[in-house]
Amino acid sequence: MTKVSKERLKELEESGDVMELNLGPQHPSTHGVLRLKLRLEGEVVLSCDPVIGYLHTGVEKECESRTYHQVFTLVDRLDYLSGPAEEQAFAGALERLMNIEVPERAQTIRIILLELSRIASHLLWAGTSALELNMSSVFMYSFAEREKILDLFEQVSGARMFPSLWRIGGLAKDLNSDFISHLKEFISGFQKIWKELDRLLTDNFVWCKRLQGVAVIDQEICKQYMCTGPVLRASGISYDIRKAYPYLGYENYNFDIPTHIDGDSYARYLVRMEEMLQSISIIEQAIARLKPGVVLTNDRKVALPPRKELARSMEAVIHQFKLISEGLHPPVGSVYNCVESARGELGHYVISDGTPKPYRLRVRSPSFSHVEVLKKVLRGHVISDVVVAIASVDPILGDVDR
């Protein structure tokens, strides 16, 4: 859609015929309980003021009364579409603070699950965004593929959206015997579906007209609002935590960082589509690198002993009793650990006072920046573009409010 010029905007503001409209907090197009206070003159948006807080759960404060092991079940519900990324951000912070070496097999499995989570999140984004523009076929294709990923998560962890599989020093359990075969089957089918989604959307006249030129977020705005992830890369800045600050051995994987220079909603769509292919490439490399071994550190001051040891080792029983009753005791200090989630830089800042519970947990959310940037980019657009703009930055309100 065409954006109104600054001169025309000034005329509309001086006309005096301005209407205030609340979009949300209960509206299907806001992707959560987000409220936008819009000032309109006719169909033209004069200003946009995002109002957050409707999904505030106090998770950061709640973590202060939970042991480090219990925190995992809380943090993966913040960005509820990227639970593995939340768990990796927190686990990685503790592992850095305590100098814990994660077994190689556990690192590789973590990468597989993180990239599957990224693909699932982008599929949900593509499906819901297309549905808002009455493209139901894309919605059905996307959700059918996402369902297969959720089945894979259920197979390995027993849960579909909140795996809670991460542990400090590794993973709760290893992959079952047929997981890799099912994963390869998914990869083979997904590449065909990706081509179909690309055919349905990339050159679609309606899709292009509705997205191109809408909510342009250039490099200066990205820096001003600290945007990351696909929003940043769609403006032409090639920045990805997996490349800039590698973790879990990402530096040993060959993958590209998709970028585009237009900075509009269509560019963000292209970045996410290309990211899904890069994630598939990373998963295939991880499968090839997967070697037999343990998936949890053998440091008994950090990790519970295997169940089979409890029946024959008094030392294992003592370690389990002390770890459960007294908890984990990280050294006094603080650490910031960030990962590349589906939405951008997700960071956990953990302060330890030496007790079994965090003194403070602060979450750096990518969605918060992307919601705030809407006030900058929606001015001058027509109201029908607001829905497209919200979808294009892909906010998760559980990640915003915390």
From Swiss-Prot:
Signal peptide: none annotated. It catalyses: a quinone + NADH + 5 H(+)(in) = a quinol + NAD(+) + 4 H(+)(out). GO terms for cellular component: plasma membrane. It comes from the Bacteria. The keyword NAD applies. It is a peripheral membrane protein. Its EC number is 7.1.1.-. Keywords: Cell inner membrane, Cell membrane, Membrane, NAD, Quinone, Translocase, Transport, Ubiquinone. One of its GO terms (molecular function) is NADH:ubiquinone reductase (non-electrogenic) activity. SUPFAM superfamilies: HydB/Nqo4-like. It is found in: Cell inner membrane. It holds the Pfam family Complex1_49kDa. NDH-1 shuttles electrons from NADH, via FMN and iron-sulfur (Fe-S) centers, to quinones in the respiratory chain. The immediate electron acceptor for the enzyme in this species is believed to be ubiquinone. Couples the redox reaction to proton translocation (for every two electrons transferred, four hydrogen ions are translocated across the cytoplasmic membrane), and thus conserves the redox energy in a proton gradient. NDH-1 is composed of 14 different subunits. Subunits NuoB, C, D, E, F, and G constitute the peripheral sector of the complex. Belongs to the complex I 49 kDa subunit family. This is NADH-quinone oxidoreductase subunit D. It comes from Protochlamydia amoebophila (strain UWE25). The gene is nuoD.
